[in-house]
Curated annotation (Swiss-Prot):
Family matches, as PANTHER family: CYTOCHROME B
Organism: Salmo trutta (Brown trout)
Entry protein name: Cytochrome b
GO CC terms in record: mitochondrial inner membrane; respiratory chain complex III
Record-listed heme b b562 binding positions: 83, 182
Role played: Component of the ubiquinol-cytochrome c reductase complex (complex III or cytochrome b-c1 complex) that is part of the mitochondrial respiratory chain. The b-c1 complex mediates electron transfer from ubiquinol to cytochrome c. Contributes to the generation of a proton gradient across the mitochondrial membrane that is then used for ATP synthesis.
A Gene Ontology biological process term: mitochondrial electron transport, ubiquinol to cytochrome c
Alphabetically ordered keywords of this record: Electron transport, Heme, Iron, Membrane, Metal-binding, Mitochondrion, Mitochondrion inner membrane, Respiratory chain, Transmembrane, Transmembrane helix, Transport, Ubiquinone
InterPro entries in UniProt: Cyt_b/b6_C, Cyt_b/b6_C_sf, Cyt_b/b6_N, Cytb/b6-like_sf, Cytochrome_b, Cytochrome_b_C_euk/bac, Cytochrome_b_N_euk/bac, Di-haem_cyt_TM
Cofactor(s) this protein requires: heme b
Membrane spanning residue stretches: 33-53, 77-98, 113-133, 178-198, 226-246, 288-308, 320-340, 347-367
C-alpha cells in the first residue's frame, strides 16, 4: 500500500514541497535564507498577534498601551522585543536572499523573481505602517514625511495624501487604518509566498554552478530539512540574543518620546533597513525626482533579468562581474550610512555619488561586463 503522505490530497502537497522534493546536491548555505524568511514571517505573525491582543490603535492610548505591554503583560517585553528586532532579522534575511539571487543568476526564473520583488515591496509597506503604531516621535514624523511624498504625484498628489491620512494631517484616522493594514499585510505576504514557492517548484532550485542539476538531485528531507533546521537555530539564537541583551540597539531614541505634532525631531530617519532607499530619495534635490528614484531603487530589480547579457548564469566563474557585485554591496553599505546622517556637506555629495553608482551598476556596468566576458570567452 502506498504511503499516506504520497496519496492524501492535502499531505501530498506538503510532501512534494518539503519531503520528496528533488533538490540540487550542491546548493550552499546561501539557499537557507528562503526558509529563514518563512520562519521570520511565522515569528512576526505570532508575536504580532499577541501584541495586537493588548494594543489600542487610538492616538490617546497607543503609546501607553505599548508601555503597558512592556510593563504589565506577562512576558510582554519579550514579545515586543522579539517583534521589533524580528523585523530587522527579516530584512537581513531578505537582503541576503536577494543578494544570493543576484550573485547566482536566480533572477532568470522570471516569475519567481518578480513575485519576490512584489514580496519585498509588501514587506517594506508592512514594516513602514508597523513603525507608526507605537506613536512615538519618530513614528509620527516618519509617517508624516513618507506619506507626504505622495503629494509629488502630479495633479492628484494633494488629494491622495489627504485620502491616505483620512484628514488634513496624520491623526487618529491614520493610526487606525495603519493598524488595520499592518494586521492584514502579513497574510497577503503569506499568500504571495505560496505563489513564490509554486513558481519555484515549477523549475526547481538553481545551484552555485548555474548549470542543470537534473543528473544529481537529492531529496529535500532529510538533507535540507536538517540543514534548514541548523539555520533556524542560528537565526533564533541571534534574534533572542539581540532581543534579550540589546533590544534597543537598532531602534531610535526619539521613539521613547510620545508623538508631538508641535515638536519636530532634529533628524527624521526611518529604521536602518530603509536607510539606503532614504539616502537615494534625499540625494535628488527635487520632490518628484526623489520619489521616482526611491521607487526605482527597488523596481530596478525587475529589469535585472532583462539586462542579463552573459552566456553564463551565475557569477561563480565571472571575476569581472563579481567585482561589480561586491562594489554594489559596498555601495549599499555607504548609502545605509549616508541615510542616517544629517543633510550637510560632505554627506550630500557622497550620497549623490553612491546613488549614481547604484543605478549605473544595475543598468550599465553589469550588462557591459556580461558582454565583455562573452567576448573574452570567444578569444580563448
Amino acid at each position: 500500500m502506498a504511503n499516506l503522505r504520497k496519496t492524501h490530497p492535502l499531505l501530498k502537497i506538503a510532501n512534494d514541497a518539503l519531503v520528496d522534493l528533488p533538490a540540487p546536491s550542491n546548493i550552499s548555505v546561501w539557499w537557507n535564507f528562503g526558509s529563514l524568511l518563512g520562519l521570520c514571517l511565522a515569528t512576526q505573525i505570532l508575536t504580532g498577534l499577541f501584541l495586537a491582543m493588548h494594543y489600542t490603535s487610538d492616538i490617546s492610548t497607543a503609546f501607553s498601551s505599548v508601555c503597558h505591554i512592556c510593563r504589565d503583560v506577562s512576558y510582554g517585553w519579550l514579545i515586543r522585543n522579539i517583534h521589533a528586532n524580528g523585523a530587522s532579522f527579516f530584512f537581513i534575511c531578505i537582503y541576503m536572499h536577494i543578494a544570493r539571487g543576484l550573485y547566482y543568476g536566480s533572477y532568470l526564473y522570471k516569475e519567481t523573481w518578480n513575485i519576490g520583488v512584489v514580496l519585498l515591496l509588501l514587506t517594506m509597506m508592512t514594516a513602514f505602517v508597523g513603525y507608526v503604531l507605537p506613536w512615538g516621535q519618530m513614528s509620527f514624523w516618519g509617517a508624516t514625511v513618507i506619506t507626504n511624498l505622495l503629494s509629488a504625484v502630479p495633479y492628484v498628489g494633494g488629494a491622495l495624501v489627504q485620502w491616505i491620512w483620512g484628514g488634513f494631517s496624520v491623526d487618529n484616522a491614520t493610526l487606525t487604518r495603519f493598524f488595520a493594514f499592518h494586521f492584514l499585510f502579513p497574510f497577503v505576504i503569506a499568500a504571495a509566498t505560496v505563489l513564490h514557492l509554486l513558481f519555484l517548484h515549477e523549475t526547481g532550485s538553481n545551484n552555485p554552478a548555474g548549470i542543470n542539476s537534473d543528473a544529481d538531485k537529492i531529496s529535500f528531507h532529510p538533507y535540507f530539512s536538517y540543514k534548514d533546521l541548523l539555520g533556524f537555530v542560528a537565526m533564533l539564537l541571534g534574534l533572542t540574543s539581540l532581543a534579550l541583551f540589546a533590544p534597543n540597539l537598532l531602534g531610535d531614541p526619539d521613539n521613547f518620546t510620545p508623538a508631538n505634532p508641535l515638536v519636530t525631531p532634529p533628524h527624521i530617519k526611518p529604521e536602518w533597513y530603509f536607510l539606503f532607499a532614504y539616502a537615494i530619495l534625499r540625494s535628488i534635490p527635487n520632490k518628484l525626482g526623489g520619489v521616482l528614484a526611491l521607487l526605482f531603487s527597488i523596481l530596478v530589480l525587475m529589469v535585472v533579468p532583462i539586462l542579463h547579457t552573459s552566456k553564463q548564469r551565475g557569477l561563480t566563474f565571472r571575476p569581472l562581474t563579481q567585482f561589480l557585485f561586491w562594489t554594489l554591496v559596498a555601495d549599499m553599505l555607504i548609502l545605509t550610512w549616508i541615510g542616517g546622517m544629517p543633510v550637510e556637506h560632505p554627506f550630500i555629495i557622497i550620497g549623490q555619488v553612491a546613488s549614481v553608482i547604484y543605478f549605473t551598476i544595475f543598468l550599465v556596468l553589469a550588462p557591459l561586463a556580461g558582454w565583455a566576458e562573452n567576448k573574452a570567452l570567444e578569444w580563448t
